[in-house]
UniProtKB/Swiss-Prot annotation:
Localization annotation: Cell inner membrane
Protein's name in the database: Ion-translocating oxidoreductase complex subunit A
Domain of life where this protein originates: Bacteria
InterPro entries, per database record: Ion_transpt_RnfA/RsxA, NqrDE/RnfAE, NqrDE/RnfAE_oxidrdctase
Main subcellular localisation: membrane
Membrane topology: Multi-pass membrane protein
Length: 213
């Protein structure tokens, strides 16, 4: 109703721009909060559990994943649109996307190693493991399945990365507080971490219906 009202009071071109920008904003919000890739789609759980013990490491991992996810989404879209479809080799999509992600991760690893050796050491094995992070491959494949255009692919990849980073940083903050709390012995370690992740997932259920994609 709001979009219809706006389209009536605005000139045609301005109304179209407004509607398009609104759709992009809703796509971003929906990807970050409503359809969070970790808590709703259960993708990227390995780094979510493995790199969330320290807040500093979680922030670094979130930044690296944001860069990789966004760039990989763009590269995957270009490969799909200008290589796989024109040549009729869509059956090589998964393998091609894995190669694209591996190249992007290698580039990211080189950048982090040069710019922040301390962060590179803190991330350790988890930085190259972004290659096998199912969230990165999942975003690339879902972009194709949803028939997103170039801009939508960028927004979808960026939104997925922001959603991943958000829950990773929140989870790391809570785990640091839990680490110094008086937790009963049977719940220490992975047990309390899984319970905390479950409570976070329930909290994010409150965003259900906020955006209908």
């Amino acid at each position: 109703m709001l979009l219809l009202w706006q389209s009536r009071i605005m000139p045609g071109s301005e109304a179209n721009i407004y509607i398009t920008m609104t759709e992009y904003l809703l796509l971003l919000i929906g990807t970050v909060l409503v359809n969070n890739f970790v808590l709703v789609k259960f993708l990227g759980l390995c780094p979510f559990m493995g790199v969330s013990k320290k807040l500093e490491t979680a922030i670094g991992m979130g930044l690296a994943t944001t860069f990789v996810l966004t760039l990989a989404s763009v590269c995957a879209y270009l490969v799909e649109s200008y290589v796989l479809r024109p040549l009729g080799i869509e059956y090589l999509r998964t393998m091609s996307f894995i190669l694209v992600i591996a190249v992007v991760v290698q580039f990211t690893e080189m950048v982090v190693h040069k710019t922040s050796p301390t962060l590179y050491r803190l991330l350790g094995i988890f930085l190259p493991l972004i290659t096998t992070n199912c969230a990165v491959l999942g975003v690339a494949l879902l972009n194709i399945n949803e028939n997103h255009n170039f801009i939508q692919s960028i927004i979808y990849g960026f939104g997925a990365a922001v959603g991943f980073s958000l829950v990773l940083i929140l989870f790391a903050s809570m785990r640091e507080r839990i680490h110094v709390a008086d937790v009963p012995a049977p719940f220490k370690g992975a047990s309390i971490a899984m319970i905390t992740a479950g409570l976070m997932s329930l909290a994010f259920m409150g965003f259900t219906g906020l955006v209908k994609l």
